[in-house]
Amino acid sequence: MCIRDSSCTLADIAPHIFPLAALDGTAARVETYLREKGVELRFNAGAAAIGKRPDGGYTAAFTDGSALDADLIVLCVGTRTNLPFLIPGQINVNRGIVVDDHMRASVPGVYAAGDCCEGNNLQSGQTQVIGLWERAGTQGRTAGANLAGENAVCDGGMVQNITHFFDMDFISVGDKRLSGESVSFTGQGGRLYIEAVVEAGQIRCVNLLGGHRISGVIRSRLWKTARGSARGLSPEEIGLLRREDVPEGFITLLGGSGL
């Protein structure tokens, strides 16, 4: 809408942009970027009511007491499990159906996969709904194989987020809720921004702005770390990171040294 010179406002009940994925420094940069593009941002302002005006437009009222007139309103809601058909207490349910690594629910013979279930978060060790297509596919194959009498295992997943807007890519890998020290790096003349949470020398979560070419290396590294199989970066991986002007300090944190 902003590209077409229309006034655009993004309102969110959350305190900042991408609340489940963006670290503080990354969120601040994204918000500055959006405002520079002409997007008005309102946070801590969830939609309370939407009314139609006599002229055909609409008025949105927000939970912070403010209101906004608009010609077009788009209401966006994230993933939510749809489980009203289950009798309360019949099966173990949190935000989703809780399953083990065979995708078995708490009732024998019942399996669940995809957005309706809570699988293992490899980093936290807790069950969590991880609404990703790749995870849903793996969970579905595991559940199907076990229903057919096999012994398949899905050890878990990792929280990830990839969003493209205007000419910017935002990528998050890892669980931002995990404790640690926040560190940041810039490269490519400021076009690349990296923010990471580090605990005991291990990266727990990474935010990238403008770094889609290096996201695969980072994702692979965090997956291996979560599974306890991480080793040093390969020469090819280090070469890719250096070609993309990734700071040496971050390469070292990832496990690249001596080359």
Label the predicted regions.
Residues 11, 52, 61, 99, ...:
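Hydrophobic alpha-helical segments, especially N-terminal targeting/anchoring helices
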Residues 7, 40-41, 59, 92, ...:
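Conserved beta-strand segments of alpha/beta enzyme cores
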Residues 9-11, 42, 74, 111-113, ...:
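Hydrophobic/aromatic beta-strand patches that form the interior of the parallel beta-sheet core
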Residues 51-67:
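Conserved beta-strand-loop-beta-strand element in the redox core of flavoprotein oxidoreductases
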Residues 4-49, 154-162:
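Rossmann-like dinucleotide-binding cores of NAD(P)H-dependent redox enzymes
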Residues 67-142:
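FAD-site-proximal beta/loop scaffold in flavoenzymes
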